[in-house]
A protein has these predicted regions:
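A short hydrophobic beta-strand->loop->alpha-helix junction that borders the nucleotide-binding pocket
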Residues: 87-98
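Post-Walker A helix-loop "phosphate-sensing" segment adjacent to the P-loop in P-loop NTPases
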Residues: 74-85, 113
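A short, basic N-terminal segment
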Residues: 1-52
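The catalytic "switch" region of P-loop NTPases
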Residues: 150, 163-222
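Walker A/P-loop nucleotide-binding motif
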Residues: 49-70
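Mid-core helix/loop region of P-loop NTP-binding domains shared across ATPases and GTPases
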Residues: 4-14, 36, 99-106, 114-175, ...
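Conserved catalytic network of the ASCE P-loop NTPase/AAA+ motor domain
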Residues: 46-50, 81-86, 131-136, 157, ...
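Residue-level preference for the first positions of well-ordered beta-strands
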Residues: 52-56, 89, 140
């Protein structure tokens, strides 16, 4: 066994901690700071009444959507009270190839709902979800992998997904931030009266983080 292989078996606790810090660090940028501020704006402005302001954050795999969501969660942790957990910022992922009913069940489970959804259809599950979000003190929802809800060639299915999303926002009265692939925004075109697109006026794109060699950076400045 060569020395390069064995060196990873003798990593010290201090080295492990440093590796963990590097792997979990959040690297800020003007664009990411702006998106974080936009998310917070949607949350706070929506508390002033009227229709909630929602937001769509798009980016290719590895661009940093999940990391950005984790940073906002870090800034707004769950608070434990005597009779409930206060989840001001609710975070979840759309399951793969999901339909509204599956998505509602997934979100209910992530909020700690323990009752069986057997026999319940999407409208009833959505009503329960909206009520539970309000009970848990949710002020904004960050929902990742949004493309899983629209990965279909059926326009009818897309219209159904758009309608469900609008119903969830209306029943809860809470803003939603959707994270997904760039093509995810097609769902905003599948709403019959275009009101869904009006809810998601704020749309941002995250570009992949790139490291520019110092020599190239110097050339750009010269």
């Amino acid at each position: 066994m060569n020395e390069l292989y064995k060196r990873y078996d003798s990593i010290t606790e201090e080295q492990n901690q440093k590796i963990e810090q590097v792997r979990n660090c959040y690297i800020s940028s003007p664009n990411l700071d702006r998106i974080l501020a936009d998310i917070h704006r949607c949350r706070k402005i929506s508390q002033r009444g009227g229709y909630p302001d929602c937001m769509l954050v798009m980016g290719e795999p590895g661009a940093g959507k999940t990391t950005l969501r984790a940073e906002y969660l870090r800034l707004n942790p769950i608070r434990e009270e005597s009779e409930r957990s206060v989840i001001n910022v609710f975070s979840s992922d759309f399951p793969e190839q999901s339909v509204p009913r599956q998505a509602a069940i997934c979100f209910l489970q992530d909020l700690g709902h323990e009752l069986s959804p057997k026999g319940l259809l999407a409208p009833e599950l959505t009503r329960i979800l909206a009520n539970l979000m309000i009970h848990c003190g949710v002020e904004i929802s960050l929902l990742d992998e949004f493309q899983h809800l629209i990965e279909t060639e059926s326009y009818k299915v897309l219209k159904g997904a758009a309608k469900w999303l609008k119903i969830l926002i209306n029943k809860s009265g809470l803003p939603v931030v959707l994270f997904g692939m760039p093509y995810s925004k097609i769902i905003l075109e599948c709403d019959d009266d275009d009101t869904l697109a009006g809810r998601f006026m704020i749309q941002r794109t995250i570009e992949p983080f790139r490291i520019i060699p110092l020599c190239q950076h110097s050339c750009r400045l010269s």
